[in-house]
């Protein structure tokens, strides 16, 4: 049987594909097509992230909040059994890499793109952490906000490297 969250995510991917195909065949202007595809990808990404972090998470009995910055690192250093926390850090960074890629793809100037990546990564992550706390859907952690913001900047950097590589190949 297909679990409800997986079904909803599959359905949203199907809707994304339909939206992109519709945009590609409806509009002839390349800039309009690019913008439409980016908006569709951004909305799908946002839905995926919110589904994974809030919508389809189990409700916890109590609220938990860790506002001390770098508490994960201290825990990992002090308790070798908590080494799986490294994976949590890596996954939090990776979760926001696509967000940074999309910010880069929207074509902002470098300085503005960096500011947008930092602010939007911080704000989206803060919204998620606050919602997890409010709705009992996870532990609210400042470390997660930091790691997500780093992931967003990393995604932006990856975008710039990809674009530079494409320009070199085209020459």
For each of these PLM feature ranges, what is it?
Residues 1-136, 142, 156-171:
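Bulky hydrophobic segments
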């Amino acid at each position: 049987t297909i679990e409800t969250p997986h079904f909803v995510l599959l359905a949203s991917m199907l809707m994304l594909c339909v939206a992109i195909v519709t945009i590609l065949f409806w509009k002839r202007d390349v800039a309009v097509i690019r913008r439409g595809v980016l908006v569709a990808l951004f909305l799908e990404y946002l839905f995926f992230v919110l589904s994974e972090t809030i919508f389809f998470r189990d409700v916890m009995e109590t609220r938990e909040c860790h506002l001390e910055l770098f508490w994960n690192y201290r825990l990992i250093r002090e308790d070798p059994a908590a080494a799986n926390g490294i994976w949590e850090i890596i996954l939090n960074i990776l979760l926001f890499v696509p967000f940074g890629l999309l910010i880069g793809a929207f074509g902002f100037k470098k300085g503005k793109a960096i500011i947008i990546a930092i602010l939007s990564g911080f704000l989206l992550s803060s919204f998620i952490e606050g919602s997890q706390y409010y709705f009992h859907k996870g532990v609210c952690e400042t470390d997660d906000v930091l790691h997500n913001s780093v992931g967003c900047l990393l995604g932006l950097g990856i975008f710039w490297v990809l674009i530079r590589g494409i320009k070199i190949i085209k020459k």
